[in-house]
Curated annotation (Swiss-Prot):
Alphabetically ordered keywords of this record: Aminoacyl-tRNA synthetase, ATP-binding, Cytoplasm, Ligase, Magnesium, Metal-binding, Nucleotide-binding, Protein biosynthesis
Pfam family, any one: Phe_tRNA-synt_N
Matches recorded under Gene3D superfamilies: Bira Bifunctional Protein, Domain 2
Protein name (Swiss-Prot/TrEMBL): Phenylalanine--tRNA ligase alpha subunit
Catalytic activity: tRNA(Phe) + L-phenylalanine + ATP = L-phenylalanyl-tRNA(Phe) + AMP + diphosphate + H(+)
Gene source species: Methylobacterium nodulans (strain LMG 21967 / CNCM I-2342 / ORS 2060)
């Protein structure tokens, strides 16, 4: 065996025996580095005669190429082995329980949950949902709803007015969702049965009031709609929402420009130890306002009060959420405190409350 064959066998054995990338790099430097065995042989070519160089040159260059090729092949083999080892170490057992993710840590805001509950209950009664813009015209927010000029609700201390539009139309942030009822009556033919949830705005802020709050109003327009129908709907809603089998309600005469007659509704409750319970006790708590739609409102919407009639009601979503779930202060609803939301919020898959169902 010649010296070149012996050197090649030795170097190839070292390459194949390298256990990792670091050892393989050491073999490469020892063979092909500046002072490596093969590199030193290449340096001797310059001192040889042309005949010797012609004979030895191809042999030494061939040795260099074969050693270099063996190193590349070994490096690829080691990389594949390292990848397989890493994949084995990072193997995921799909049978293990998953880690708690955002969908379990996150919470649904109580307002969102209560809106879902309200729509589920009224949806079971056959109501549709109607929506409208937060920015309304003075005509839709007041005039069409029988608010005369000079009414206190038109004053700056109650309403957020905006700069007039290009056509001079007076704009404002709606003070109730009643404009949605006007839009609905103008767009649809009776019979109409809708609820109108949404944000409303009034210039007020304390423990039970915020400048922006949520309201839901209901509207029924038909030839024979009457107060008995209104009373049944409100009773069924209160039983289903507060999850009680029965509840007493008290209708007190009141005044709203858009209804005649008008009433405020109190619900039976008990107050013990700072806790309010509905469907029992001898106390009363006001929860909403209602009444028969005023003939002037029907006329503003293009309806003939001699042919159709209807009733409407409205209640504060934030307030009934506080009552049902025992929240003492309204302001944290809008402060984005994750601790509060984690305590009072709902899991994403919690089903909207319709426990009692409807009795009729």
């Amino acid at each position: 065996m010649t010296d070149l064959q012996s050197l090649e066998s030795d170097l190839l054995a070292q390459v194949q025996g390298a256990p990792d990338e670091a050892a393989l790099e050491g073999v490469r430097v020892a063979a092909l580095g500046k002072k490596g065995a093969v590199s030193e042989l290449l340096k001797t070519l310059g001192a040889m005669s042309p005949e010797e160089r012609k004979e030895r040159g191809p042999l030494i260059n061939g040795l260099r190429d074969r050693v270099h090729g063996a190193i590349l092949a070994r490096r690829e083999t080691l990389a594949e082995a390292a990848l397989e080892a890493r994949l084995a170490a990072e193997r995921i057992d799909v049978t293990l329980p998953v880690r708690e993710g955002p969908e379990t840590r996150g919470r649904v805001h109580p307002i969102t949950q209560v809106i879902d509950e309200i729509t589920a209950i009224f949806g079971d009664m056959g109501f549709s949902i109607a929506e409208g813009p937060d920015i309304e015209t003075d005509e839709l927010n007041f005039t069409a709803l029988n608010f005369p000029e000079g009414h206190p609700a038109r004053e700056m201390h109650d309403t957020f007015f905006l700069p007039p539009g290009r056509d001079g139309t007076r704009k404002l942030l709606r003070t109730h969702t009643s404009p949605v009822q006007v839009r609905t009556m103008r767009a649809q033919e009776p019979p109409i049965r809708v609820i109108c949830p949404g944000r409303t705005y009034r210039h007020d802020s304390d423990q039970t009031h915020t400048p922006m709050f949520h309201q839901v109003e209901g509207l029924v327009i038909d030839r024979s709609a009457n107060l008995a129908h209104l009373k049944w709907i409100l009773e069924e809603f209160c039983k289903a929402f507060f999850e009680v089998e029965s509840v007493k309600m008290r209708f007190r005469p009141s005044f709203f420009p858009f209804t005649e007659p008008s009433a405020e509704v109190d619900i039976q409750c008990s107050r013990q130890g700072g806790e309010i319970r509905f469907g029992e006790g001898n106390d009363w708590l006001e929860i909403l306002g209602c009444g028969m739609v005023h003939p002037n409102v029907l006329r503003h919407c293009g309806l003939d009060p001699d042919q159709v009639q209807g009733f409407a009601w409205g209640l504060g979503i934030d307030r009934i959420a506080m009552l049902k779930y025992g929240m003492p202060d309204l302001r944290p609803f809008f402060e984005a405190d994750m601790r509060w939301l984690d305590h009072y919020g709902f899991r994403p898959l919690d089903i909207p409350s319709l426990v009692g169902g409807l009795t009729g």
